C-alpha cells in the first residue's frame, strides 16, 4: 500500500504483473480482516439493512513529530502523507463495502507540520448509485482515532477503535442500530 508513489510507478507494477501471471500481486490492506470489518461486510452482503446511503470515516494519528527527518515526511520516498499512510485504509474499506467511486472532491493541507506531504485530507466521494462517502484523514488528531459510520436505508453501523500492536486506537467495537 499504495501500489506506487506516482502514476508511472503504478504503470510499472501493472506491467510486471502482466508479465508474471504465475505470481500473485497483493497489497497490505489488512483492515479487511479485522473482526468488526468482517462482520460489517457480512451485514452488507446479507442486505440486512438495505442499500448503503453513506459512509463517514475518520482516521487520525496523534502526532507526526517522530517523523521529522523520517522517510514518511518526504514525498520523494513516501509518495504522500497521512492519506497514503492511514487514510488509504479507510478508502479501501469504502470500496470493499460498495465498489468504486466515480466522483471525488477533496482538499489537502500541510498547514500545521509544513512538510512536503499532507497532514490533513478531507474528501467527499460518490459512486454511480449515488452512495456518498466522506473521509477525514489527519496527522493533527492529537489522539489516535479510527471511526467508520455506515448509514443504510434501515440501519446504521459504527466501527470504532482498531486492533493494533500499540492498542492506541482503542478497543475495537461494532455498534449495530436498526432503524426505529
For each predicted feature, which ranges?
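Well-ordered beta-strand positions enriched in small/hydrophobic/aromatic, beta-favoring residues
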Residues: 55, 71, 104, 123, ...
Amino acid at each position: 500500500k499504495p501500489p506506487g508513489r506516482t502514476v508511472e510507478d503504478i504503470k510499472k507494477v501493472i506491467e510486471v504483473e502482466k508479465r508474471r501471471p504465475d505470481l500473485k500481486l497483493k497489497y497490505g490492506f489488512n483492515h479487511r480482516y479485522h473482526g468488526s470489518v468482517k462482520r460489517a461486510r457480512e451485514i452488507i452482503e446479507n442486505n440486512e439493512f438495505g442499500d448503503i446511503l453513506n459512509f463517514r470515516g475518520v482516521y487520525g494519528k496523534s502526532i507526526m513529530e517522530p517523523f521529522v527527518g523520517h522517510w514518511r515526511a518526504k514525498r520523494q520516498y513516501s509518495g504522500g502523507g497521512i492519506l497514503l499512510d492511514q487514510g488509504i485504509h479507510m478508502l479501501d474499506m469504502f470500496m470493499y463495502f460498495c465498489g468504486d467511486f466515480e466522483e471525488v472532491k477533496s482538499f489537502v493541507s500541510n498547514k500545521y507540520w509544513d512538510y512536503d506531504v499532507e497532514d490533513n485530507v478531507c474528501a467527499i466521494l460518490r459512486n454511480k448509485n449515488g452512495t456518498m462517502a466522506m473521509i477525514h484523514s489527519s496527522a493533527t488528531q492529537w489522539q489516535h482515532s479510527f471511526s467508520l459510520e455506515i448509514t443504510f436505508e434501515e440501519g446504521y453501523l459504527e466501527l470504532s477503535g482498531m486492533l493494533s500492536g500499540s492498542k492506541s486506537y482503542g478497543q475495537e467495537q461494532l455498534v449495530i442500530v436498526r432503524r426505529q
